[in-house]
From Swiss-Prot:
Protein name: Small ribosomal subunit protein bS21
Bias kind Basic and acidic residues: ranges: 32-42
GO annotation, biological process: translation
Keyword Lipid biosynthesis set for record: no
Region (Disordered): 32-58
Any matching Pfam family: Ribosomal_S21
Species of origin: Moorella thermoacetica (strain ATCC 39073 / JCM 9320)
Any one GO CC term of the record: ribonucleoprotein complex
PROSITE patterns registered for this protein in UniProt: RIBOSOMAL_S21 (PS01181)
GO molecular function: structural constituent of ribosome
Skewed-composition ranges (Basic residues): 43-58
């Protein structure tokens, strides 16, 4: 769980930006989107191979 403590002279906007950055780096949102719906193992493998193929040629 990402947690941000606001400093004495820190604005709420700055703390929110820091929280968003921490969440983005830890991959919380992308993981939540990935797990939003169940994905069959065969579909997961297919997506993985597609991504590898894409990385190889681009």
């Amino acid at each position: 769980m990402s947690e941000v403590k606001i400093g004495k002279n820190e604005s709420l906007d700055a703390a929110l930006r820091r929280f968003k950055r921490i969440c983005q780096k830890s991959g919380v949102l992308s993981e939540a989107r990935r797990r939003e719906h169940y994905e069959k193992p065969s579909v997961r493998r297919k997506k993985k191979s597609e991504a590898a193929r894409k990385r190889r040629w681009h």
